From Swiss-Prot:
Provenance organism: Escherichia coli (strain K12)
Name of the protein in question: Recombination-promoting nuclease RpnC
Pfam families the UniProt entry points to: Transposase_31
Domain of life: Bacteria
Keywords: DNA recombination, Endonuclease, Hydrolase, Magnesium, Nuclease
Gene null: resulting phenotype: A quadruple rpnA-rpnB-rpnC-rpnD deletion shows no change in basal RecA-independent recombination.
Job description of the protein: A low activity DNA endonuclease yielding 3'-hydroxyl ends. Upon expression enhances RecA-independent DNA recombination 2.9-fold, concomitantly reducing viability by 59% and inducing DNA damage as measured by induction of the SOS repair response.
Hydrolase is among the record's keywords: yes
Family that this chain belongs to: Belongs to the Rpn/YhgA-like nuclease family.
MF (Gene Ontology): double-stranded DNA endonuclease activity
Listed NCBIfam families: T_den_put_tspse (TIGR01784)
Nuclease found in the keyword field: yes
Gene that this sequence comes from: rpnC
EC number: 3.1.21.-
Length: 300
């Protein structure tokens, strides 16, 4: 059964706390001293909107205020939970609502995160409030959660990782090497390293196909014939470079009529020719006869 959108609790709560003077009294009384000292409650301003999920609006109500905190924008988010039994997920919900308020602040063209102070107003049957208000306590390992979320997040900055180190990364090495250099270098300069990694046998046939098509779309080399020819010779598993028909299927394009397919084939062939590939290799890749490739060459 759908929860009602409003309740008597909802109505009376908002009737009081939507008034600035009443809200100021509430916050002066109930905000912890260390937080109250951060806030200039004379700047308190009621904000529009709600962060409560639709499925919970019959059980929860919220009010959001903006306020200056030590001269910077901040928010106070008050949630009233009017269920008879407290929600075991409430601490996590409060964190999620706070992040939603931060996100809305960023969407308004701000480039810094505001401090959002979540406040729960509880009036349930169980007394005192029986649950922790620390979201870390909801984790299987609260101490580990504190370490993870109170520290900078792990960063894999491949741009500063030496190539020699990347070459030791086994199955992920070929992807990292390409991601590092795809924009900056002629792919021919990577050929020796790519061949070494392919010969080590870590890369599957389907991964090689994906890698080669990625290089065709995003990479650059002045010696495309030699580069792609060498790579084809090193392939394993019997898989060759993706034909255009396969490319169509992967991209969801193989749905049109033959005329549409022919036009896209010619466009693809033109891109390959512009990268310096021979007409024979382009014909194989684009799945077109040499006569069609010659027509494309005449159009370039």
């Amino acid at each position: 059964m759908d929860a009602p959108s409003t309740t008597p609790h909802d109505a009376v709560f908002k009737q009081f706390l939507m008034h600035a003077e009443t809200a100021r009294d509430f916050l002066e009384i109930h905000l912890p001293v260390e937080l109250r000292e951060l806030c200039d409650l004379n700047t308190l301003h009621l904000e529009s909107g709600s962060f409560i999920e639709e499925s919970l609006k019959g059980h929860s109500t919220d009010v959001l205020y903006s306020v200056q905190m030590q001269g910077n924008p901040g928010y106070l988010h008050v949630v009233i939970e009017h269920q008879s039994k407290p929600d075991k997920k409430m601490a996590f919900r409060m964190m999620r609502y706070s992040i939603a308020a931060m996100h809305r602040h960023l969407e308004a063209d701000h480039d810094k995160l505001p401090l959002v102070v979540p406040i729960l107003f509880y009036q349930g049957e169980a007394t005192p409030y029986p649950l922790s208000m620390c979201w870390f306590d909801m984790f299987y390992s609260p101490e580990l959660a504190r370490r993870v979320y109170n520290s900078p997040f792990p960063l894999v900055d491949i741009t500063i990782t030496p190539d020699d180190e990347i070459m030791q990364h086994r199955r992920i090495a070929i992807l990292e090497l390409l991601q590092k250099h795809i924009r900056q270098r002629d792919l021919m300069l990577l050929l020796e390293q790519l061949v070494t990694l392919i010969d080590e046998g870590y890369t599957s046939g389907s991964q090689l196909v994906a890698m080669q098509n990625y290089m065709l779309q995003r990479g650059h080399t002045e010696q495309a014939d030699l580069f792609y020819g060498v790579l084809r010779d090193r392939e394993t598993g019997g898989e060759s470079m993706m034909t255009l028909a396969q490319w169509f299927e992967e991209k969801g394009i193989e749905k049109g009529i033959q005329q549409g397919r022919q036009e896209v084939s010619q466009e693809f062939a033109q891109r390959l020719l512009s990268k310096g590939m021979s007409r024979e290799d382009v014909a194989e890749m684009a799945n077109l006869p040499l006569a069609e490739i010659d027509k494309v060459i005449n159009l370039i």
